[in-house]
Design a protein with these regions (language model features):
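Intrinsically disordered, low-complexity, compositionally biased regions/tails
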Residues: 11-12, 21, 25, 67
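Signal peptide processing junction and immediate N-terminal pro/mature segment
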Residues: 18-33
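Non-catalytic cap/lid and distal C-terminal segments of serine-dependent acyl enzymes
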Residues: 32-316
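Residue-level recognition of conserved structural "scaffold" positions that shape functional pockets
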Residues: 14-15, 24, 97, 248
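N-terminal export leaders
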Residues: 1-13
Length: 316
């Protein structure tokens, strides 16, 4: 590449490969430098979800602080009040659940379905998931098998029943005979624990990808508790991702991850529990039991289709 140097000094000309006395050829006009348009001053604001509110609530029962998210339909409540669904892991799951409920509200004149109030139960944290807090609150006592930092499910259920529900019912008209609980993973385990130990707390239970394996499958020993309150006739939906027991090719990797998936038996445990409960449905006082396997979903991705299926099941 030729470099033409303007200035005429012999030394510079020599350095440029021109003989002394030679005249450098005129340089081509410099290309115009593109000037970026001035960036207007902007003031980004935190995005908010329409028709949603939140507050931080300290619990006397658990001694913990929770972030409560609330979305109320803009449609008039039925005479008995709005149905309501309580959604665990509220920081992560509430936005999707609230948008799904708003879709129901927009189509209510066509479908005849009443959109529910959505209550997200989260934590006063900037994270989507507060792992230590959910491990504490969502796991049952399990007769000493729960481990350190776990086993607080009964106190957390007390918080929902004794502190949170009265607050929600004071905020908007609620149909106390149309209440649902949704939980995923440890939250799904908590949902089963609530069903088996306090079946009158909700009318619909949605256990998504429940961690039945926890504490040597302790939650299965709680099933007989249903029979003590069979007059309440609760409904149960179990969901699980197809890929929760074995990773999908070509991403599957042999070794530790595959062994953990196989050991937890997420898909088999959900299926087996559904079969067991269906066989004893009348004796246990269950109105309905259903299990849905979500195609090509893993443990994390199964949350969102489970929310959709759970909302549909609740409103049927």
């Amino acid at each position: 590449m030729r470099r033409l140097v303007l200035g005429g000094a012999a030394a510079l000309l020599a350095c440029a490969g021109l003989p002394a006395g030679a005249t450098a050829a005129p340089a081509a006009p410099a290309a115009a430098t593109a000037t970026a348009p001035a960036t207007p001053a902007v003031d980004w604001q935190a995005a908010g979800l329409a028709q949603a509110r939140q507050l931080d609530l300290a619990s006397a029962r658990t001694g913990q602080r929770y972030r409560i998210f609330l979305s109320v339909p803009d449609t008039a409540p039925p005479p008995a009040g709005h149905p309501v669904i309580y959604v665990l892991d509220g920081n992560a799951a509430f936005p999707s659940a609230a948008l799904m409920a708003r879709t129901v509200a927009r189509r209510s004149k066509v479908t005849g379905l009443h959109a529910p109030v959505v209550v997200g139960i989260g934590y006063a944290s900037a994270e989507d998931y507060d792992e230590p807090a959910r491990a504490r609150d969502y796991t049952p006592p399990a007769a000493g098998k729960a481990g350190a930092g776990k086993g607080g499910a009964d106190l957390f259920l007390d918080f929902i029943e004794q502190e949170l529900k009265p607050l929600i019912q004071a905020s908007t008209p609620i149909d106390t005979q149309r209440q649902a609980l949704f939980g995923h993973s440890y939250g799904g385990l908590f949902t089963l624990h609530a069903l088996f130990t306090r079946p009158a707390a909700f009318q619909t239970y949605v256990a998504a990808s429940p961690s039945i394996w926890f504490a040597e499958r302790h939650v299965l020993s709680e099933v007989p508790g249903l029979a003590a309150a069979r007059q309440h006739q609760p409904r149960l939906l179990l969901t699980v991702g197809e890929l929760e027991q074995a990773a999908a090719p070509p991403s599957a990797k042999a070794g530790e991850r595959g062994a953990v998936l196989a050991q937890k038996r997420m898909v088999d445990e959900a299926r087996d529990l559904a079969v067991r409960l269906e066989a004893r449905k009348q004796a246990l006082g269950l109105e309905r039991v259903r299990v849905i396997e979500l195609p090509r979903e893993n443990h994390g991705s199964a949350l969102f289709p489970a929310l959709s299926r759970g909302l549909e099941f609740f409103l049927e």
